[in-house]
Amino acid sequence: ITHYVGIAVRQAGDDNVHSYRIPGLVTTNDGTLLGVYDVRHQTNIDLQEDIDIGMSRSTDGGQSWEPMKIIMDMGEYNGLPQGQNGIGDPAILVDERSNTIWASAVWVHGLANARAWRNVKPGMTPEDGTGQLMLVKSTDDGKTWSSPINITSQVKSKDMTMLLQGPGRGITTQDGTLVFPVQYKSVNRQLRGEIAIIYSKDGGKSWHRSNA
């Protein structure tokens, strides 16, 4: 009989955080486990709230985990508080050719704690009140991470009110293409969502969106 033991990597109240949600998990080329998730500081409610992206790392197959690191935090952009600069719903992937790790998340700016999916607006910039698709990357097996990279202008059209990654994980295809699933809605579709992928054929230097 095989017995499996679950390990609680993050629990409500850890590091004085209200809730942890929306996990994604990958194994790097070196066998390291990397988990990403929403760090929901004050409440378990979805964006727009005070939310950052946390990361946990294990080099022994998940038996032990290093202390949590915050890898995406949009701070008080434009002078607005953290609660109006939340970033959440992460996905993570490993570039199997280079072992570069990419994490994606959606940043929402200035909604004053309104629910993002219903209240974001069309446009391209944070000041437009539209969702921003952000990436970070690690080139040292998840030990350190880049500053956030905004790829909204590469993959979003102006009529879309919200474009965000599909939470969880992305993939590397056999030809080395990096792929994240995405979901979006546009002005003429109201609350109805559509799905597509974003992909990079140059190791993450540029990104493109497929048709729905």
Predicted regions: what they are:
Residues 1-212:
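Asp-box/BNR beta-propeller blade signature and adjacent active/binding-site loops
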